[in-house]
Amino acid sequence: MTYRTTYEIQAVEIAVHLFGRFAFVSLFFFVILQIDNLANCIMTITELIQGQGTAFSFEVLPPKKGEGIEELERTVETLLPYGPKYINITTHHSEPVYKRLDNGLVEVEMVRRRPGTVAVAAALQYKYNIPIVPHILCSGFTKEETEYVLLDLQFLGISNVLLLRGDRNPNDAMFRAEPDGHQHTTELQEQVNRFNEGFFVNGDPIPSPGVPFSYGVAGYPEKHDEAPNIETDIAWFKKKVTGGATYGVTQMFFDNSKYFTFVERVRQEGIDVPIIPGIKPITSQKQLTSIPRSFHCDIPEEFTREMMKAETKEAQFQVGVEWAVAQCKELMRAGVPSIHFYTTGQARSVNEVAKQIY
């Protein structure tokens, strides 16, 4: 209350001194609105999704290296009318890029195709006054680099993050952490927890600790592709929750029964945090194979048949939208607290789905 009162008094003094009564009233309400927006940005995700109805959120990708932010802003502005409670932004580690040299040899260079997550997160949060949730990865980052990310985010007033292991290098059979990096999300959680407690990764105390981070983790209704079975995967999810995660957000799925079964089994383990379903509209026949290959999820036969009947690109798009709408309506009837949409850089399909359910 003191925080708000201080700003109100300053607004009154400036307005009366410079502009008189009309400006005083206008500026007073402007300041109140901005402080309310600021309050939203420092709320946790579990606080933001509380209340009646099913909350809306979505994920975006940072621009490719060398590209501008305008296309990303258009994606955000397309989906703003549906009142997103927060927006996730992905983080990308370096990937191998192969270049053929003049002598016929091949050179391998590690390149981050989409840098700038922290800067873009700050730009979006302060432009749109919506909480932004950057992803923090084990993959491709050392503990010290992770610490720098946490410090940068804290300076920028971003206190919600999603902690993930991240994908393995495509050339590796198994995930390999960076030297002095984290092998598992649970190890990354331990670092964030210690940071929240006021300690750097080397054990030194942080002179001026900031607002502690609140974080979520991933859940896999069809199990993580490296898990030997669903029981093992749920045990890992439970470990992440007991380690400090306040919510889970699932990998995309296309059969709601997989989500409902996952939630039921998780609840049987005594886990009561919100589990937010992740939805991605499939909008082309090509995605029937590319999405399972990339995200290790099944596509129902009924949906596959309908998609294969569609002869034009627009017809395929509509089949995918209709399936996602049906998924969302069933999830909403079941009382899910929120639905999280994966845009993968394309807002049109999510816009068409949201238009019909929000």
Q: Where are each of the predicted segments found?
A:
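N-terminal amphipathic alpha-helix/helix-capping segment at the start of soluble metabolic enzymes
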Residues: C41-F58, F200-P212
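Active-site mouth loops of central-metabolism enzymes
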Residues: S57-E71, V133-E144, S214-T232, K309-E322
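Conserved, mostly hydrophobic/aromatic
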Residues: E59, I87, L153, K240, ...
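Catalytic domains of carbohydrate-active enzymes, especially glycoside hydrolases
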Residues: T75-T90, T242
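Glycine-rich, proline-tolerant flexible connector loops at the mouths of alpha/beta enzymes
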Residues: K85-P115, R168-P179, T246-Y259, T344-Q346
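Catalytic cores of alpha/beta
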Residues: K143-D152, T261-E264, S284-K286, S349
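Flexible, glycine-rich active-site loops centered on histidine and acidic residues
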Residues: K143-E190
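Active-site pocket-lining/capping segments in soluble small-molecule metabolic enzymes
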Residues: G166, P179-P212, V217-E226, E264, ...
